[in-house]
Design a protein with these regions (language model features):
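Alpha/beta-hydrolase superfamily serine-hydrolase fold, recognizing
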Residues: 1-166
Length: 166
């Protein structure tokens, strides 16, 4: 396939990897995909956004309990140490925290996120980055839904979500 027939995408940490893949391809002057789809992208592993709080964790049945455990049991602000080695943590590095990247020249991107999920601010921050950098994008925030709700294939919203990818 040629690059204009390829879209990349991922959910959660896979959304992070999709965003970082674009940055790396552009840095290497490689062909870019035609489009990107990010479902609840973990674009701020440093957890600097406003949605990283107890209230949102209580609403998010998928990752809320994990983050609450990280916050209380391990006294950590974020889970970034599970993503990169402690000595490599640099939240200003866009290859770790895409919210700090320059997305000029990025192909069109679709982001979908649950309005009741812990990573909500990650998606909102990425939309701000895309608007700043002139990236064509589509954004859908699903009311009363949690992180990667699309995994529940029985929900009507999951079906509608996947129909939007066409």
């Amino acid at each position: 396939y040629s690059n204009d027939e390829i879209a990349i995408g991922g959910d959660s940490a896979g959304g992070n990897l999709s965003l970082v893949t674009f940055l790396k391809l552009r840095e290497l002057n490689e062909a870019l995909p035609a489009a990107m789809i990010c479902i609840s992208p973990w674009a701020d592993p440093a957890a600097t956004g406003e949605s990283y709080n107890e209230e949102m964790a209580d609403k998010d049945p998928l990752i809320g309990p994990l983050f609450k455990k990280i916050w209380s049991k391990f006294n950590m602000k974020s889970a970034i140490g599970y993503y990169v080695k402690k000595e490599d943590v640099d939240q200003s590095n866009p290859f770790i925290c895409p919210i700090n990247g320059d997305f000029s020249g990025c192909p069109p991107v679709m982001i979908q996120v649950g309005a009741d999920e812990l990573l909500l601010s990650d998606s909102r921050s990425m939309i701000n980055v895309f608007e700043r950098d002139g990236v064509i994008h589509e954004y859908k925030e699903w009311e009363n839904l949690w992180h990667v709700f699309q995994l529940d294939g029985e929900m009507e919203e999951s079906t509608k979500s996947f129909e939007m990818f066409r």
